[in-house]
Structure formats: C-alpha cells, structure tokens
UniProtKB/Swiss-Prot annotation:
Function statement: Plays an important role in the elongation step of protein synthesis.
Protein name: Large ribosomal subunit protein P2
Highest taxon above the source species: Eukaryota
Keyword S-adenosyl-L-methionine annotated: no
Keyword annotations of the record: Allergen, Phosphoprotein, Ribonucleoprotein, Ribosomal protein
Annotated segments matching region Disordered: 61-111
Organism for this UniProt entry: Davidiella tassiana
Entry's family note: Belongs to the eukaryotic ribosomal protein P1/P2 family.
Keyword rRNA-binding in record: no
Biased composition (Low complexity): 72-88
Length: 111
C-alpha cells in the first residue's frame, strides 16, 4: 500500500510516469526502506496505465462495497443478575486495554 500511495502521490504532483528511484525517494523521506521486489511488481502492474483512470476505477469499486449498515446482535441480553455484577469490572478492564491500544487512533499511515 505504501508503494502505491507514493506512486499516486508522485502522479498527482505531475510525474506521469514515476520511476523506482522516484518512489524510493518519497518513501525514504518518511523513513521507509523500499523492497525492490514489491516495488518492481507494482511498477509492472501499473506500467502504461493512467493514474486518473486508476483512481476513478478504484472509486467505482469502493462505491460497490457495503459499508456498515447492520448492527451487531447483542449477545449478553439474557445474563443472570449475579453474572451482571461480575461482568461490569471485566468490561472496565477491557475498555482500559482498548484505550491503550488505540494510541494511533486507528490510523497507520503507510503500514
């Protein structure tokens, strides 16, 4: 994904045919080492394709993907009263763990 993002960034900046060196320069500017095999594979796949057509094609494909809609079913609705008292501290611990793991707010740019 990071290679594609660098390719598209270069294309949108006016470089209609980014080379492997151009992509490596963009990636190294943010501290990422480029993998030659992946980079050459990407360039082979995108060779001769227009960046704007790729973006519009991708947008059309994303529009057809379902996003959310149905809510998750509640699994603990019929718990006994004694079990509910024990579940509360457990839920607090799970919430605390979740908060700690979301330090990057779910955004892992170029991961």
């Amino acid at each position: 994904m990071k290679y594609l993002a660098a390719f598209l960034l270069l294309g949108l900046a006016g470089n209609s045919s980014p080379s492997a060196e151009d992509i490596k320069t963009v990636l190294s500017s943010v501290g990422i080492d480029a993998d030659e095999e992946r980079l050459s594979s990407l360039l082979k796949e995108l060779e001769g394709k227009d960046i704007n057509e790729l973006i519009s094609s991708g947008s059309e494909k994303l529009a057809s993907v379902p996003s959310g809609g149905a809510g998750a079913a509640s699994a603990g609705g019929a718990a006994a009263a004694g079990g509910a008292a024990e579940a509360a501290p457990e839920a607090e611990r799970a919430e605390e763990e979740k908060e700690e793991s979301d330090d990057d707010m779910g955004f892992g740019l170029f991961d």
